[in-house]
Amino acid sequence: MSFDYINALLKKPTSRTPIWIMRQAGRYLPEYRATRAKAGDFLTLCKSPELACEVTMQPIDRFDLDAAILFSDILTIPDAMGLGLYFMEGEGPKFRNPIKNLKDIKKISTDLNNDLSYVFDGVSTIKKSLNNRVPLIGFSGSPWTLATYMIEGGGRIFASTKKMLFNDPEALHLLLMKLTKSVIAYLNQQIVSGADSVMVFDTWGGVLSEQNYLDFSLYYMAKIVKGVKAQHPNIPITLFSKNGGKYLTHIANTGCDGVGIDWTVELYQVQQEVGNKVAIQGNLDPAVLYATPEVIEREVKKVLSQFKGDTGYIFNLGHGITPDVDPENVKILVDCVHTFSKECR
């Protein structure tokens, strides 16, 4: 099968600009909320291959999207490491057993794939359900981002993580190396189970200084790229560091196929900077989806007009879609991208 999304990542010709949306299976869809209610709680939803398949397919059935993304959570790996993941309504993820010191890190196992079999069963179930309609994206969190959750136990302050970074960097590097080993095995098994491409979400890479970003985040993502490509050289891999616009040249040098960008950088500048090396994914501000259809169309045209050429670009938001967006506006977005991308070529 030839898919525009995969071809764009590999810089092969595409029939139109492909689009998928971060968190496209989510709370903004009434059918998702119904399935979530049926599951009882978020973790049960994630850990049921059948229900994960159901919610993965919902946006594919509703919109003319060019890729599906596995419905799961980036914190499946820390959960399998025994940290006791749970979710508080309105507060996000928490861990019952956060990492406090080197002793805790040394106890962590990296051989997790047996405990994550529900994810791989979900991938194969989704792949079968898709029946080659669109490609399937697998994913993981980056080691740095996973470590922040594991050390903080939740929240977005990062005081404990940065305390370890400055006071005991060797301990943090050990944790990041263990996570890297687990992520490589995790993504490779997703590919074996049917994922057509994979993505690494570095949600909190942008909170680091440049040197710390290179040492504590990108260094390990580069190892992941190498570890995935060693086993699956033809499977494209995308890296996305939120607020990482100033690091794009470094990211493009990892050997990845695509880089995700947010709305704090201009697409045309990114294309000039790294477009000769990697495909680019992004970068509409998610808040545009609160606007009128006319404004959505205007903003889509603004983004599309910045990219020159007929491949190497995937339209997406600059971050995940928000839960209170009107699904009708998502349809307008998707249809606009496909219509106007043909005009812009």
From Swiss-Prot:
Q: Which UniProt keywords apply?
A: Cytoplasm, Decarboxylase, Lyase, Porphyrin biosynthesis
**What pathway does the annotation place this protein in?**
Porphyrin-containing compound metabolism; protoporphyrin-IX biosynthesis; coproporphyrinogen-III from 5-aminolevulinate: step 4/4
Provide the catalytic activity annotation.
uroporphyrinogen III + 4 H(+) = coproporphyrinogen III + 4 CO2
Gene Ontology biological process terms from the UniProt entry = protoporphyrinogen IX biosynthetic process from glutamate
Q: How does it assemble?
A: Homodimer.
HAMAP family in the record: URO_D
What is the official name of this protein in its record? Uroporphyrinogen decarboxylase
Per the UniProt record, the lineage of the source organism begins with: Bacteria, Pseudomonadati, Pseudomonadota, Gammaproteobacteria, Candidatus Pseudothioglobaceae
